């Protein structure tokens, strides 16, 4: 079985070395590592050149991460395709675990591993030889996927901790990733149309958070997730079975409600109410409708009687200098 690793690289001079080193230090090495320089204007091309004997390098004018991923998927030859962003890090056993999951669950269309957040531009130190081991493994049916995704989006929101069998991309279409600021969530949701996914809770990926990252703004993130559902709605209506479509619609309504809370917390009541009204139309489920209408009523109460709405900004835990 052949494994391909795909790494988009854009203006990542401060992190790309540690990212590529984490790939090259795997206990079960990748068969090919494809790196695309997406029109970087910093020292990234020079750094990548120093790895040319160990990875396959490509370069193009800046077209965005979705385009890069689609290009690299088309060029990959592995049976299992692994993705890694240019600022995240893998535990040395990451590919070893993913290969085993692939062999144990040939019916699965994606394999996610657990991750841990870390802050700034520094390195992440894995704790001891036993780190990255253990955890539970779940096979999540397509019908249950949106329930899990809606309850905790984080485990499925980044492809740095996801591997996908190459055969699956033939079912997803020519452009499984779309440029919108939520490329991972778009492709992730598409996978539910194809089959079950596997989740291994062992923390095998270090996901880097930086102060300037848009992912620190939950309001922006939820807005992107709502947009993903808007783009996918027609495709699910046309191709999903009744039960999967219902699960998708309930998740869509729930994401709108979560987004509405954040809009209220950032002083945008008109936009929040628009989301809640749309959420009523997203799902015919009576409980979902009742939740949306109840929240809509709360937005019209005098401010002292309203709940404490979340503001949506992640509290920064790193150094102020990064």
Where are the predicted features?
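Conserved donor NDP-sugar-binding/catalytic core segment of glycosyltransferases
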Residues: 93-129
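Glycine-rich, basic loop-to-helix element that forms the pyrophosphate-binding segment
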Residues: 60-76, 97
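Acidic helix N-cap motif at the loop->helix transition within catalytic regions
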Residues: 14-17, 40-50, 89, 93
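Short aromatic/hydrophobic "clamp" motif used to bind/position activated sugar donors
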Residues: 81
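Short, well-formed alpha-helical segments that are part of the catalytic scaffolds
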Residues: 11-25, 32
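Conserved nucleotide-sugar donor-binding catalytic segment
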Residues: 74, 132-225
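A conserved acidic beta->alpha catalytic loop
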Residues: 22, 29, 37-46, 63, ...
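C-terminal subregions of glycosyltransferases and related glycan-biosynthesis enzymes
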Residues: 148-156, 180, 186, 193, ...
């Amino acid at each position: 079985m052949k494994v391909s690793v795909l790494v988009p690289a854009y203006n990542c001079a401060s992190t790309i070395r540690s990212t590529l080193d984490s790939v090259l230090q795997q206990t079960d090495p990748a068969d090919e590592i494809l790196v695309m320089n997406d029109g970087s204007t910093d020292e990234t091309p020079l750094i990548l050149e120093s790895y040319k004997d160990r990875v396959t390098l490509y370069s193009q004018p800046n077209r965005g991460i979705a385009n890069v991923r689609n290009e690299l998927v088309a060029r990959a030859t592995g049976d299992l395709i692994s993705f890694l962003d240019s600022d995240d890090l893998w535990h040395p056993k990451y590919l070893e675990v993913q290969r085993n999951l692939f062999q144990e669950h040939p019916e699965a269309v994606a394999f996610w591993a657990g991750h841990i957040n870390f802050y700034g531009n520094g390195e992440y130190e894995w704790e001891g030889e036993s780190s990255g081991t253990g955890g539970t493994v779940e096979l999540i049916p397509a019908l249950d996927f949106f329930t899990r995704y809606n309850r905790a989006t984080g485990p499925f929101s980044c492809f740095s901790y996801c591997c996908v069998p190459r055969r699956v991309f033939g079912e997803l279409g020519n452009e499984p990733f779309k440029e919108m600021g939520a490329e991972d969530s778009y492709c992730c949701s598409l996978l539910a149309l194809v089959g079950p996914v596997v989740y291994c809770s062992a923390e095998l990926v270090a996901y880097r958070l930086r102060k300037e990252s848009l992912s620190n703004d939950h309001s922006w993130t939820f807005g992107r997730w709502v947009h993903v559902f808007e783009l996918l709605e027609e495709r699910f209506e046309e191709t999903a079975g009744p039960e999967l479509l219902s699960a998708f619609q309930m998740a869509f309504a729930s994401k709108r409600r979560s987004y509405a809370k954040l809009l209220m917390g950032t002083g945008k009541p008109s936009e929040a109410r628009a989301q809640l009204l749309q959420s009523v139309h997203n799902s015919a489920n009576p409980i979902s409708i009742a939740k949306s209408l109840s929240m809509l009523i709360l937005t019209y109460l005098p401010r002292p009687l309203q709940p404490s709405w979340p503001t949506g900004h992640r509290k920064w835990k790193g150094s102020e200098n990064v």
